[in-house]
């Protein structure tokens, strides 16, 4: 589950991570943002974070926005890292108007970090997360985020396991669970301010 292992011995159940990040980035671009940071965990070749970075880059490219590697902030995928990355971004003063985060917990930490720096979400900076954790809709403002059906991944894994028990020689399958964007209040229109 959630692996990009290319071994033909294993089934694969995952989401299209690149497309999810593309959706998030395209959403903020659609709201008029051009200076968009990317908050993520450690980028590993063929990993989930790398796929999400590719989706971010693709959305920028399609919109004619040059990719700037200095706007990619790597940390850990946790709350404290989100706080730290927000502080770092504020201290570097890069005129960023939006952040695409690779996980809700990272985005939620970033919201706290921005708050501590006197930066208002979404008035001063917009943010989009990834996962659609239950808490994301209870925040103020509610976190716009990429929704992935985690329970559906589990159901598909059990289904594949049972099928494989009945037929040990079955062809290995790759199942891709669709993602969608949960629009809430953490992104604002720029109205030609950039």
Language-model features: locations:
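Structural signal for short hydrophobic segments within the conserved structured cores
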Residues: 11-13, 70-73, 144, 175
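Short beta-strand elements in bilobed, periplasmic/extracellular small-molecule ligand-binding domains
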Residues: 57-81
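Flexible loop/hinge segments that line or gate small-molecule binding clefts
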Residues: 1-23, 65, 105, 131-143
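Flexible loop/turn connectors
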Residues: 31, 85-193
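Structural motif
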Residues: 21, 74-92
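An alpha-beta-alpha
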Residues: 24-63, 173-187
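Short acidic capping loops at alpha-helix termini that bridge into adjacent secondary structure
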Residues: 34-35, 67-71, 121-126
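Short beta-strand/turn micro-motifs composed of small residues
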Residues: 2, 14, 40, 74, ...
């Amino acid at each position: 589950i959630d692996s990009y292992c290319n071994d033909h011995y294993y089934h694969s159940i995952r989401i299209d991570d690149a497309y999810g990040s593309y959706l998030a980035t395209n959403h903020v671009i659609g709201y008029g943002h051009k200076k968009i940071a990317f908050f993520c965990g450690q980028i590993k070749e063929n990993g989930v974070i790398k796929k999400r970075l590719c989706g971010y880059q693709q959305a920028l490219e399609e919109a004619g926005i040059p990719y700037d590697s200095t706007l990619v902030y790597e940390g850990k995928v946790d709350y404290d890292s989100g706080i730290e990355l927000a502080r770092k971004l504020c201290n570097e003063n890069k005129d960023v108007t939006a952040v695409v985060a690779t996980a809700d917990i990272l985005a939620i930490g970033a919201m706290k970090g921005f708050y501590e720096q006197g930066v208002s979400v979404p008035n001063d900076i917009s943010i989009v997360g990834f996962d659609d954790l239950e808490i994301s809709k209870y925040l103020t403002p509610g976190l716009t985020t990429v929704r992935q059906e985690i329970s559906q991944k589990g159901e598909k894994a059990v289904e594949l396991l049972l099928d494989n028990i009945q037929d040990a020689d079955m062809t290995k399958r790759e199942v891709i669970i669709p993602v969608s964007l949960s629009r809430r209040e953490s992104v604002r229109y720029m109205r030609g301010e950039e």
